[in-house]
Regions:
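C-terminal catalytic core of tyrosine-transesterase DNA break-rejoin enzymes
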Residues: 275-302
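A short, glycine-centered helix-capping/turn motif at helix boundaries
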Residues: 72, 142-146, 152-180, 287-290, ...
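Non-catalytic DNA-binding core/recognition domains of DNA-processing enzymes
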Residues: 6-92, 254, 274-278
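Flexible interdomain linker/hinge and immediately adjacent N-terminus
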Residues: 78-134
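Basic, Lys/Arg- and aromatic-enriched nucleic-acid-binding interface segment
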Residues: 118-160
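Conserved tyrosine-mediated DNA breakage-rejoining catalytic core shared by Y-recombinases
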Residues: 165-217
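Short, basic interhelical loop/turn and adjoining N-cap
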Residues: 13, 172, 301-307
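Active-site/catalytic core of tyrosine-dependent DNA strand-transfer enzymes
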Residues: 205, 209-269, 274-275, 280
């Protein structure tokens, strides 16, 4: 099985990364199960199939091909072709983002953080009337989820790590270390603050387990309401919007909800977690970055040098 081969070849990769690579490879294989990697031998055909994709997407597909091919010790010349594509796009990506300019797609969908936050406030007002209802319909649950997800991302701009299992503190404590490593958990103690335990994310091998205590008053209050009204007998934090019963098991499920809400509420703007991270950090640090760049020019060094050498705690 390819996943096992990749994991043996690259033990540092997280399950999230391996699953993303496998998903990309299935797409390159026309959506068919992967029995071998012969479809990657047609390099020109693969590049033609990706010709209309944005550069970051092409880079991700090329990287998936590299990981798979090197795991089975494929022809080095073929690996180099994909590596050259990835490296060129990495350089292009780095040079572009060094300018701090928005991509055309980001520009088309960008809103200021205050505008997005106002959207969340409006969604909160829309669900205010259901807070005292004892029984929630599917439509009510869907509407509340469409408020809660954007709210969470304005407070905690993670990637898409909110595919989570809800557990009590005692149930979490009974999990083995191996069980904890395999998932992301929303821990809701009877007493004390709620917190997130995140092990499955893109850079988990580098940064390890993340434990995030929830202390934002609006978010905590809204989550308490949600925990009371989620579909009974379920352990997922969020759900597929159709039916509101099936757990949201992929980051794509979260993205669909986020972009659907922003398109409806913000005049067609498509804002998922990735773009919202840019918007959030730009609002928080853009002026600071401009000041650092100006000071660095006067002082004759780079911003990176200023951060690493001159700025002290």
């Amino acid at each position: 099985m390819l996943s096992m081969i990749i994991r043996k070849s690259r033990p540092h990769l997280s399950d999230v990364s391996i699953n993303q690579y496998l998903s990309s490879l299935r797409t390159l294989n026309g959506g068919q199960p992967i029995n071998d990697l012969n479809f990657l031998n047609d390099f020109d055909g693969v590049m033609m199939a990706l010709s209309k994709k944005k550069p970051t997407t092409v880079k991700n597909y090329a990287n998936a091909a590299i990981v798979a091919l090197t795991s089975v010790a494929a022809d080095p010349a073929l690996v180099k072709k994909y590596s050259d594509v990835r490296d060129a796009l990495n350089t292009q990506y780095s040079e572009f983002h060094a300018t701090h300019e928005k991509t055309p797609k980001q520009e088309a969908n960008w809103v200021e953080f205050g505008v997005y936050r106002s959207m969340v406030d409006g969604l909160r007002e829309e669900v205010a009337g259901v807070l005292k209802e004892k029984e929630w319909s599917v439509q009510t649950r869907r509407k509340y989820q469409e408020y809660l997800l954007p709210l969470i991302f304005t407070v905690l701009p993670l990637r898409n790590e909110f595919v989570m299992t809800v557990v009590s503190k005692s149930a979490f404590n009974r999990l083995t270390p191996a069980e904890k490593e395999k998932g992301n958990y929303f821990v809701a103690p009877q007493k004390g603050p709620m917190f997130l335990v995140i092990n499955q994310y893109k850079t988990s091998k580098r940064y390890g387990e993340k434990i995030i205590e929830l202390d934002d008053p609006e978010l905590v209050a809204s989550l308490k309401v949600w925990l009371k009204h989620r579909p009974p007998g379920t352990t997922s934090l969020f759900f597929e919007p159709v039916g509101m019963v099936e757990p949201a098991t992929t980051s794509g499920s979260i993205t669909k909800v986020m972009t659907a809400v922003s398109k409806r509420e913000l005049g067609g703007k498509s804002i998922g977690s990735s773009l919202l991270r840019h918007i959030f950090l730009s609002a928080k640090y853009a002026d600071t970055l401009k000041e650092m760049e100006a000071d660095a020019e006067v002082m004759g060094h780079s911003v990176e040098t200023a951060q690493k050498i001159y700025v002290k705690n």
